[in-house]
């Protein structure tokens, strides 16, 4: 395992730990999810470039499309919640009422 792979795995781990530890605001959770998706995209791109498998070239692009959809849905949910409740605290949201 090269140093680049270790750094990308460390970035994913730090983003995951940030998602698990700092769950107070929805915006910080969304940023941690974007960090995880970015590290997964870079890792998938490096795997495709190292394997020279032509059918797997679309995998990082599909992952990037899913990351963009996740970001758009997350930001629209953040705007809706902040307009409705006036705050974005995750602890105060009840899933049965939203």
Swiss-Prot record:
What keywords tag this UniProt record? Electron transport, Membrane, Mitochondrion, Mitochondrion inner membrane, NAD, Respiratory chain, Translocase, Transmembrane, Transmembrane helix, Transport, Ubiquinone
Task: List where the protein spans the membrane.
Answer: 1-21, 29-49, 61-81
Stated family: Belongs to the complex I subunit 4L family.
Give any Gene Ontology cellular component: mitochondrial inner membrane
Q: Which gene encodes it?
A: MT-ND4L
EC number of the protein: 7.1.1.2
- PANTHER family membership: NADH-UBIQUINONE OXIDOREDUCTASE CHAIN 4L, NADH-UBIQUINONE OXIDOREDUCTASE SUBUNIT ND4L
Q: Name one GO molecular function term.
A: NADH dehydrogenase (ubiquinone) activity
Give the bilayer topology: Multi-pass membrane protein
Organism of this sequence: Rhinoceros unicornis (Greater Indian rhinoceros)
Database matches in Pfam families: Oxidored_q2
Q: What class of enzyme is it?
A: translocase
Localization of this protein: Mitochondrion inner membrane
Q: Which reaction does it catalyse?
A: a ubiquinone + NADH + 5 H(+)(in) = a ubiquinol + NAD(+) + 4 H(+)(out)
What role does it play?
Answer: Core subunit of the mitochondrial membrane respiratory chain NADH dehydrogenase (Complex I) which catalyzes electron transfer from NADH through the respiratory chain, using ubiquinone as an electron acceptor. Part of the enzyme membrane arm which is embedded in the lipid bilayer and involved in proton translocation.
Query: Which one GO biological process term can you cite for this protein?
Result: ATP synthesis coupled electron transport
Kindly provide the name given to this protein in its UniProt entry. NADH-ubiquinone oxidoreductase chain 4L
Q: Subunit structure of this entry?
A: Core subunit of respiratory chain NADH dehydrogenase (Complex I) which is composed of 45 different subunits.
């Amino acid at each position: 395992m090269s140093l680049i792979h270790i750094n990308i795995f460390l970035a994913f781990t730090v983003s995951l730990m940030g998602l698990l530890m700092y769950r107070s605001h929805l915006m910080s959770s969304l940023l941690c999810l974007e960090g995880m998706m970015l590290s997964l995209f870079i890792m998938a791109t490096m795997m495709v470039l190292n394997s020279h498998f032509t059918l797997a070239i679309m995998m990082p692009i599909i992952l990037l499309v899913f990351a963009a959809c996740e970001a758009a849905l997350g930001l629209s949910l953040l705007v809706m919640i902040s307009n409705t409740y006036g705050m974005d605290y995750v602890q105060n949201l009840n899933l049965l009422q939203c």
